Every structure is written in structure tokens, then in C-alpha cells.
């Protein structure tokens, strides 16, 4: 054990260098790597040193593009599950009675079925005790089927407790860190997504969704789900509490409550998570595949910074993405980046802008941000992300890259009005030189922000394929997002002359009175208050 902890201090990280990790990935057969584009071979070598590797035939990957289809598939997979259902989400919407009923019916129909749910404790109990919340919605499943069949866990950031928690408003508490993974597993299949489980994500909130029908990959994410669950509170019934539920710390958990001994908790959680982040179970069906079937390689990457020792953060997401972006060194390469909450990590932004590849950024227009026209402080959140987009455009201009890097705003109606949608998609796509379709994508929960790499728990996958159909489907996914995207440039932030009524003389005849000077105003959805400038400078890392 001493040697394990001494290793922490012998491998200190710096902001300027990306560390090399050791994994238990076997060396890829030369016949396999040679069948991919030559530019991808070095990427395989670099990612093999960071994250576990899975070979998944492209026929086992399905891309969904519509929230209604996502919901229908989710319900169908729950209904047909025989062994296990595991759902990791920020929260389950307090009105999702149909989804809970679907899980209940699956449990009733199959006595061998086990259900495991992981949400965030702060977000999942925000409305309690006055109103319904995720916890009050879920507790009837435990009451009816027992905690031996329904294991509901709620992760609480270890870095918020005591006076800080009691004095800070509930919604502000959530800025200290959340369980942000979105893993939806059913037997030997899993959906990776950026979507949570609430009605807007099932109807009119655009996101991304990949369905993998692969047992080994599903088992890996199930292991991640279980590990974080074993560092979380368990939701149980309570006849004494007005809410009908309580959160308790099981003795079977892998460490003590963080509020009791934070140092020990971080030590135990680091010890638990390191082998999962770096290794995979060696038992593998890949050797049964013909070389012709090996057309897609997947690297699961996760960011668990709040649970890891600060001197040895062995999270794999940030390091893998920065390695991947070092590949953008050719004008013949294309990349696409999207985030509904646009506040790009500076190191990611630097690599995207500094590379030679041409790029497209898609972000939410203010009227597609779920906080648009909301009450209180959150009213200014769309402005904050708009400011981040403006700063990005300024940096692109300063680097002389306006001809090859474009930013688009996604908008489909006005959120919270009839037929209005919001935008929550996040991801990255990259092509090889001289190809129009991407062959690499990242799917998962991360928004690629400073917050994602310091406060929240994130889980994603890097997908690299040579399959023509899967590449086409990746491009179709981009095209689907671009349908509602319009260019945003720095000129859009400039004041524009407003239409003036034709001057009328006292006698009522038009044109005889001298016209008023033109009135110049910035468009309503381009205005950014001074307070937002200050707030982003101070609190930008929480966005």
C-alpha cells in the first residue's frame, strides 16, 4: 500500500505536459492497424497508453438523433431487460411517472431482474421536502420491490459539507460539483448520451444518443456505475421523515462518509477507481472476431477529479482529448465541436484554434438555452455563454483563422414556448485528411469545460471507425444538428440601425419635417451586460 501512495507523488502532473499512463491493453495486431488510415495508427498508440480499449463491430453501434426515438428505445430496452438495468443520470424528472411505471412493470414481470440507479444527491433532492423530486419519485420502487432488487444511489460531492452547505442556497450548492454521467444500460446493451431522464429530453431538447449492443463494453460501464455507487448514499424508505425517504451511507460502501474523513475518502476512492480507469477485464471475445469484422475501436474515457488525489488525478478524459487534438495538424482534416453550454476549457480551445484543420463549432443560441428568460440570477446564464462564444470568435479573429473556423448558433423556435426547442448536444467529430465524413467522435456527458474537468463526474467514449456506413451516419448526425444552425460572427454583436417612422410635419404631411438621426441598438439576443462580464471573470469555472 505504501508503494501505491508513493507512486502518487512520483508522478506529479503539470499543466504543460500530458502524462503517459500504463494500461493492460495488448498490442494491436499490425493487420488491424494497417487496415485503418495511416494517420490513425499513432492515435491508437497514444490512446492505448491512456484508456482501456474495446473492439466493437460497427454493426453493434446505432446512432439515434431524435429525443422521442431516444425515449421509445429507452422504454423498450427497459421492458425487455432480463438480468439488469443500470441508469446513471444527473436526475430523473419529478414528473416521469411513465418511466418509473415502465421500470416497475419490468421488475414485476421478471423476478430475476435487478435495477441499479445512480443520480446526484443535491440535484435529486433539490425540491424536497416541499415538492416532489427525483428521490420521492423513485422511492416507491424500493418500497414495492425491496432494496435487494432496486438499489438507488445518490452521489454527493465530497467537497461540500458543514457550514458552507447549510449557508448556501440549494441551487448554488450544485455549483460545487455533480454526478453528471449519463449511462443507460440494459442487460448487454448501453446507451451513452448527454441527455438526462426528464420530459424535455424526451420531447423537445436536442441531444446525442449512441446505442451499443456489446456485452464487454456494457460490463465496463456497469463497473463504473457500481464503483461510483459504492461511494454514494443509498435511498431508503423512512416512515419518520415527511418526504418518505432518507439517504444513508451503507456499511458495505468502499469508504467512510467524506464528511467524516475527507482525506481517507479520497484515498479509498482513488484506490478503487484507478484500476477501472486504466484497465479492463482481460477476458475478451475480440480474438473470436475476423479481421474483416474489426472496423471500430472504442476507448472509454472518464473524468473523476473530485474523487481522486489532487496530486495524482488519473482521470482519462482530459488527457485523451488533448492527445487527440494534437492530430489536427493538417489543412486536409476537418473537425466539428458542439456544446449547448459553451465555455470551452482553455487547453481544448487552444488546440482547436492553433491547429491547421478547418473546424465548425455549434452552440445553443440564447433562445435555445433552457435558462432563457428564467427568473432570478439564472436569467443571465444565456448571456454568460454568449459572452464565451464572443470571446471565442475574438480569439479566432486574433489568430487569423476566420476563414477556416466558423461558429454556428442552434435555434429551433424559442424554448419554453409552443413548438420551441432547447439545445443540449455535446461532442466532437474529426475526419482523416481529404475525407468529408468524420471517422472519430466522442459521445458522452462532458461539456468540455473547466467545470467538467474539476468539479463533476463525467463518462464518455472515443469512437474510431473505418466503416463507411458508420462514418456516413456520423456525418448525418452533424447534418441533423446543422439544420437549425445559423452563422454567428463578431458583426452580430455590433449596434444596428433601427427602422424609424417617417417624419411627419405638424400639418400631417409626411416628409416636410427633418428626419431624426438613426438609432443604433444591439439586437436583444446579442446584448451582454457589464455584470455578466464581471461574473464570468469570477465564476466562469462553475459554468
Predicted regions located by residue number:
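PLD/PLD-like phosphodiesterase catalytic module centered on the HKD motif
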Residues: 2-79, 97-191, 195, 199-204, ...
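Active-site cores of enzymes that catalyze phosphoryl transfer or operate on phosphate-rich substrates
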Residues: 28-68, 248-320
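A short acidic, Gly/Pro-enriched loop at the edge of an enzyme's catalytic core
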Residues: 82
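Extended catalytic-interface subdomain
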Residues: 166-170, 193, 222-275
Amino acid at each position: 500500500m505504501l508503494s501505491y501512495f508513493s507512486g502518487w507523488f512520483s508522478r506529479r502532473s503539470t499543466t504543460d505536459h500530458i502524462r503517459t499512463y500504463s494500461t493492460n491493453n495488448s498490442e494491436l495486431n499490425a493487420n488491424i492497424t494497417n487496415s485503418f488510415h495511416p494517420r490513425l495508427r499513432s492515435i491508437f498508440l497514444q490512446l492505448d497508453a491512456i484508456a482501456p480499449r474495446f473492439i466493437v463491430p460497427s454493426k453493434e453501434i446505432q446512432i439515434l438523433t431524435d429525443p422521442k426515438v431516444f425515449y421509445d428505445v429507452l422504454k423498450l430496452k427497459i421492458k425487455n431487460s432480463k438480468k439488469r438495468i443500470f441508469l446513471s443520470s444527473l436526475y430523473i424528472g419529478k414528473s416521469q411517472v411513465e418511466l418509473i411505471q415502465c421500470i416497475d412493470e419490468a421488475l414485476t414481470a421478471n423476478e430475476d431482474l435487478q435495477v441499479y440507479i445512480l443520480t446526484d444527491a443535491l440535484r435529486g433532492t433539490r425540491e424536497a421536502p416541499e415538492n416532489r423530486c427525483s428521490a420521492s419519485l423513485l422511492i416507491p420502487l424500493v418500497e414495492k420491490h425491496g432494496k435487494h432488487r432496486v438499489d438507488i444511489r445518490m452521489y454527493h460531492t465530497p467537497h461540500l459539507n458543514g457550514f458552507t452547505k447549510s449557508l448556501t442556497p440549494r441551487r448554488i450548492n450544485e455549483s460545487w460539483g455533480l454526478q453528471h454521467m449519463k449511462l443507460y444500460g440494459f442487460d448487454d446493451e448501453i446507451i451513452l448520451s448527454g441527455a438526462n431522464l426528464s420530459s424535455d429530453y424526451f420531447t423537445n431538447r436536442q441531444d446525442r444518443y449512441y446505442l451499443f449492443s456489446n456485452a464487454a463494453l456494457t460490463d465496463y460501464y456497469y463497473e463504473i456505475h457500481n464503483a461510483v455507487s459504492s461511494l454514494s448514499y443509498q435511498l431508503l424508505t423512512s416512515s419518520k421523515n415527511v418526504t418518505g425517504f432518507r439517504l444513508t451511507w451503507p456499511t458495505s460502501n468502499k469508504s467512510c462518509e467524506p464528511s467524516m474523513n475527507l482525506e481517507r475518502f479520497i484515498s479509498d476512492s482513488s484506490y478503487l477507481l484507478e484500476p477501472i480507469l486504466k484497465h479492463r477485464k482481460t477476458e475478451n471475445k475480440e480474438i473470436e472476431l475476423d479481421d474483416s469484422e474489426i472496423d471500430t475501436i472504442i476507448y472509454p474515457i472518464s473524468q473523476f477529479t473530485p474523487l481522486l488525489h489532487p496530486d495524482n488525478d488519473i482521470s482519462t478524459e482530459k488527457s485523451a482529448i488533448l492527445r487527440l487534438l494534437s492530430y489536427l495538424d493538417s489543412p486536409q482534416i476537418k473537425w466539428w465541436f458542439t456544446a449547448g453550454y459553451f465555455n470551452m476549457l482553455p487547453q481544448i480551445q487552444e488546440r482547436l484554434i492553433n491547429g491547421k484543420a478547418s473546424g465548425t463549432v455549434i452552440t445553443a443560441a440564447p433562445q435555445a438555452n433552457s435558462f432563457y428568460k428564467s427568473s432570478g440570477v439564472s436569467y443571465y446564464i444565456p448571456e454568460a455563454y454568449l459572452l464565451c462564444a464572443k470571446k471565442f470568435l475574438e480569439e479566432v479573429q486574433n489568430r487569423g483563422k476566420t476563414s477556416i473556423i466558423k461558429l454556428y448558433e442552434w435555434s429551433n423556435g424559442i424554448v419554453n414556448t409552443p413548438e420551441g426547442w432547447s439545445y443540449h448536444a455535446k461532442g466532437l467529430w474529426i475526419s482523416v485528411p481529404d475525407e468529408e465524413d468524420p471517422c472519430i467522435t466522442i459521445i458522452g456527458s462532458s461539456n468540455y469545460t473547466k467545470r467538467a474537468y474539476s468539479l463533476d463526474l463525467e463518462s464518455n467514449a472515443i469512437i474510431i471507425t473505418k466503416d463507411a456506413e458508420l462514418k456516413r451516419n456520423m456525418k448525418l448526425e452533424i447534418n441533423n444538428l446543422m439544420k437549425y444552425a445559423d452563422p454567428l460572427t463578431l458583426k452580430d454583436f455590433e449596434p444596428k440601425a433601427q427602422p424609424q417612422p417617417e417624419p411627419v410635419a405638424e400639418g400631417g404631411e409626411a416628409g416636410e419635417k427633418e428626419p431624426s438621426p438613426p438609432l443604433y441598438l444591439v439586437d436583444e439576443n446579442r446584448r451582454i451586460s457589464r455584470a455578466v462580464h464581471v461574473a464570468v471573470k469570477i465564476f466562469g469555472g462553475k459554468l
